[in-house]
């Protein structure tokens, strides 16, 4: 479960990197600042805020995986984008929904550069993220592109 939550948070941070046009170091620093501020507020109030269902508990996140993967995606973004773009029919990266692109980059990185994650797991997790965060067509689209990337290897 820890890897699943870590992957989800990594995708969210990749999305944030694209929207804010920040690098992974800036995103990690922003995350650390937010966590510190939340801890300060909780200690002042003497209570722990209720966690909403959509929020990811950092105790359930593998921060080493998160940082390693964010860095890897950033450092290999050109290669990842070339592989992704190769399998886009009548589309360009600029036309993709940012959430779909974040999922594709994350899972393509796992397929192409990570020996820790079997290709079928990366594909299935990408589809699950697409079901949760993408539109109705995202899961099939993500599945098709990632499957082609995995098969080329």
From Swiss-Prot:
The keyword Kinase does not apply. InterPro entries: NusB-like_sf, NusB_fam, NusB_RsmB_TIM44. One of its GO terms (molecular function) is RNA binding. It holds the Pfam family NusB. Keywords: RNA-binding, Transcription, Transcription antitermination, Transcription regulation. It comes from the Bacteria. Transmembrane segments: none annotated. Gene3D superfamilies: NusB-like. One of its GO terms (cellular component) is cytosol. GO terms for biological process: DNA-templated transcription termination; transcription antitermination. HAMAP family: NusB. Involved in transcription antitermination. Required for transcription of ribosomal RNA (rRNA) genes. Binds specifically to the boxA antiterminator sequence of the ribosomal RNA (rrn) operons. Belongs to the NusB family. PANTHER family: ANTITERMINATION NUSB DOMAIN-CONTAINING PROTEIN, N UTILIZATION SUBSTANCE PROTEIN B-RELATED. This is Transcription antitermination protein NusB. It comes from Clostridium tetani (strain Massachusetts / E88).
